Design a protein with these regions (language model features):
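A short beta-strand-loop structural module common to alpha/beta enzyme folds
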Residues: 28-39
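N-terminal Rossmann NAD(P)H-binding glycine-rich loop of SDR-like oxidoreductase domains
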Residues: 2-24
């Protein structure tokens, strides 16, 4: 099973991705926004990707 990171999860596109994730159980989704993960902080992103074994990143920010 692939792990997918969705950034900007509280925006319009991020919310639509949440709806799609609810019906697609083929993947494991991680939803974040700037409060949980600042995508401008490269080290924080790399740590998150490593810690959660992320396969795909979708930037909705």
């Amino acid at each position: 099973m692939k792990n997918i990171l969705i950034t900007g999860a509280n925006g319009q596109l991020g919310n639509e991705m949440r709806l799609l994730a609810e019906v697609n159980k083929e993947y494991t989704y991680f939803f974040t926004d700037v409060a949980e993960l600042d995508i401008c902080d490269e080290q924080a992103v790399m740590n998150f990707v490593t810690d959660h074994q992320i396969d795909i990143i979708v930037n909705c920010a």
